[in-house]
Amino acid sequence: MKKGLILTNAYAKLAAFSNQSSRLKEELEKLGAQIDVLKNDGFFAYINKQGEIETSLDSYDFCIYLDKDKYISQMLEKRGMRLFNGHQAIVDCDDKAVTFIRLANEGIPMPLTLSGLLCFTPDEKVSAATLDKIEKTLGYPLIAKACFGSLGKDVYKIDDRAELEKIAETLKCKPHLFQQFIKESAGKDIRVIVIGGKVAAAMLRSSQTDFRSNIELGGSGSAIEIDETLKQTCEKVASLLNLDYCGIDVLIASDGYRICEVNSNAFFGGIEKVTGVNVAARYAEHIFQQIYKK
């Protein structure tokens, strides 16, 4: 019996999360697998007194890891379970600064990026010298982001020194970064889905009310054909990060594309609707190829 697991976060409440797991379960079961969907509070994984990892999940052939809990993913992988995506790929995509560093020096076009200085003393103010460096390097407007976050949260457009000082203070005690604002891409970007190293679908996302184009923030999507240059770039990004599946957000600059973010658990409900591509089926087929048809 082919048996797989879809693991989700116990605190995830958005309908998009349940859609993700139910669609994948549906398509995997069409291929003949028994699929269980578990929240991460529905099993145990721990290190016992002998220093060995124990888990209640040993009966599964694979796990689609729809979570970002890096400790559980590392334990499961060290125990021998095949994860989609793998532990390190999830970690590298979850931290935006790490993503950019991993892609650096590889010919991947990205916005000009500064890592924010991490403050361990909340009462300390961000120095004028730090603000000067950010201003001089990026100019206005610029973008500030927390390194951890999804759905457009903790992403700020900064227009002047006063806003920079305020947001720098807000973010100083958490990992964060500052980036060049790509004005041509304000309120729009391209979401590209890559599965098994190949582009599977793409859509243009746009918003009339926000510089962020996330569907979850009120943006809309439309099907788009992307050129060979962008296809090759996105496939290279997925390869460099060792991703079985991902959604890549691409900014559109006057002189070409810029990779903005890479999402290891990108929602696919919206892109399935606007493109007609059965993303869940493509992902299920990739998993079967990796697990059962080697």
Residue ranges and their predicted role:
Residues L66-K70, K183-E184, D244:
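Short beta->alpha connector loops
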Residues E225, S239, I252-K294:
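C-terminal active-site "lid" helix and adjoining low-complexity regulatory extension at the edge
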Residues D249:
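Nucleotide-cofactor and metal-assisted catalytic machinery
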Residues K2-A10, L14-A15, S21, I90-G187, ...:
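Active-site nucleotide/adenylate-binding loops and adjacent lid/helix of ATP-dependent enzymes
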Residues L142, A200-A201, C246, R258-C260:
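Protein kinase-like catalytic core scaffold
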Residues N85, V194-I195, I252:
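Generic beta-strand structural signal
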Residues L151-V237, L241:
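Phosphate-binding site of ATP-dependent enzymes
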Residues A10-P122:
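Conserved N-proximal alpha/beta basic substrate-recognition cap immediately N-terminal to
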